[in-house]
């Protein structure tokens, strides 16, 4: 089962379908849309927690998802990068003091939230536009597709995605996926559920 972690594969074979206490970065990688829908930061964090707990109910898995959704919510609401950084450091205890240039030489492949989320946030904080954030996240190496997914969600909320990149991405997606993306964009209004 390519693309799935060993813990998930073992979980599939179990008779119980309870969450498996994962601290992996999958919870943070998939949570970006949660940062787009809710009116309050509190509600955003609550739904991010629920999203994580389905599979990643370890405190680090939950924290990673909440941190990512919080950054996206704050970026959408017009908070500055400095305000976002301060909030993340205070609320989640992530050390965001190292620059990407300091992270890069000692960074390695790490599938944990604590080894991915702060680095993705740092790439977002250092980037100057959407594309720069993406390039910076990729340049860190490690689990760079996940890093880039997380940082990209933050960059989209803060900068938007340039039209030329949207158009290029559409060339590689199916018509069905175009329809999903259009519905998402139209539904990107704040909701309460």
Which residues are covered by each model-predicted region?
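Structured, active/binding-site neighborhoods that engage oxygen-rich ligands
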Residues: 1-193
């Amino acid at each position: 089962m390519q693309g799935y972690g060993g813990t998930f594969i073992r979980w599939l074979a179990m008779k119980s379908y309870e969450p498996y206490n994962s601290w992996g970065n999958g919870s943070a990688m998939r949570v970006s849309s949660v940062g787009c829908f809710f009116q309050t930061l509190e509600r955003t964090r609550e739904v991010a927690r629920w999203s994580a707990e389905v599979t990643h109910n370890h405190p680090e898995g939950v924290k990673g998802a909440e941190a990512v959704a919080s950054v996206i919510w704050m970026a959408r609401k017009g908070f500055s990068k400095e305000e976002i950084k301060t909030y993340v450091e205070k609320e989640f205890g992530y050390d965001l003091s190292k620059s990407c240039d300091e992270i890069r030489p000692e960074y390695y492949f790490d599938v944990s939230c604590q080894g991915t989320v702060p680095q993705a946030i740092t790439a977002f904080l250092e980037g100057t536009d959407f594309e720069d954030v993406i390039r910076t996240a990729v340049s860190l190496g490690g689990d760079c597709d996940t890093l880039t997914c997380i940082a990209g969600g933050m960059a989209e909320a803060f900068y938007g995605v340039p039209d030329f990149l949207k158009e290029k991405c559409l060339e590689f997606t199916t018509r069905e996926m175009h329809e999903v993306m259009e519905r998402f964009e139209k539904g990107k209004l704040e909701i309460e559920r």
